[in-house]
């Protein structure tokens, strides 16, 4: 919230409401009207007196209408309606004088200047990276700290410290806040684009999704830089100035300004950390969706047709086209520790901090030794029966990971003749909690 807005809200709210009601203030600016207002602002800035005639407004309306082709032709009637609408909403002031022979001249009102100035200035300022904006703030704060450490009269503090903090540092903080809100909109836009791509054709969309996710990573790095710079250097500078004014009653106005800046800084850093968490969570969600949820061949229909086509190749030849896409980046943690809820009983000290990967390697070795017996004896491996017997002696929370490792070790030993005959196996239960597996008996090694 800007300093002016903070001063305004301290006034009685009913007084402001009565004022708005008395003068019948209202705003209705569709996209085309807003574009017309911005075009008028640009033309006004090019004029020394910032005054425009009706002809110039009609020309501006024609330019806008040409870019909004679906809205209709740029007739004089529609242009006059648009001008009158802006005048009615107190965005344009109309003047008529004898010097202009009855023709009207127009100027932007303070309200219109505030609206257009926001869009024009914000468009230019939002192009700056947050790291650059924070560097600008740090430079201004350094000037204020230097002046504060020099000390001096109250006039010195008002000119060289208070002025810099209130009208320079505070302004940049407000712009950073606006830029952060734009980044929130960009985050939502990226989510919508990814959802739209995946809903249309996920095969062709994976590369596009990866490009969008790379933008996410760039944003993450920028947010982390923002937190580091804002949380360290700026905080130190604020504390340095507070130390200089501590206990001096004549400099209470400096302390009030520092308190307002501290609130803005806290808001920036808090927003940054929250956004980082949201970006990471969404990035992992999309990668998980691409890895697991996009399974368009759950019934193995495609694999069966492919095997059948290979068997019939000499009778019905065909061409194979394949795409070698780059692998998606996996942003999961490199190592995961054992979950507390999975640890039961007394845990020995030597394995208390053992990582999950080490446990997986040990279990995989044991499972491999168990399955080698089937290979040595030439016996078939019915994965459904093997899994059911093996999982029965382990806690339920371990079933998913253990089943994955059993299947992984089994397919390394051999394969099923039924797979090459395109025979689809039935789903078979492997525990008493609803878990099922669909796999042919491994009978070739």
From Swiss-Prot:
Subcellular location: Cytoplasm, Nucleoid
GO biological process, one term: chromosome segregation
GO CC terms, sorted: cytoplasm; nucleoid
Region (Leucine-zipper): 213-241
Chief place of localization: cytoplasm
One Pfam assignment: MukF_C
Molecular-function GO terms, alphabetical: calcium ion binding
Keywords, alphabetical: Calcium, Cell cycle, Cell division, Chromosome partition, Cytoplasm, DNA condensation
InterPro entries: Chromosome_partition_MukF, MukF_C, MukF_C_sf, MukF_M, MukF_M_sp, MukF_WHTH, WH-like_DNA-bd_sf, WH_DNA-bd_sf
Family that this chain belongs to: Belongs to the MukF family.
Purpose of the protein: Involved in chromosome condensation, segregation and cell cycle progression. May participate in facilitating chromosome segregation by condensation DNA from both sides of a centrally located replisome during cell division. Not required for mini-F plasmid partitioning. Probably acts via its interaction with MukB and MukE. Overexpression results in anucleate cells. It has a calcium binding activity.
NCBIfam families, sorted: PRK05260.1
Name of the molecule in the record: Chromosome partition protein MukF
Lineage: Bacteria, Pseudomonadati, Pseudomonadota, Gammaproteobacteria, Vibrionales
Gene for this chain: mukF
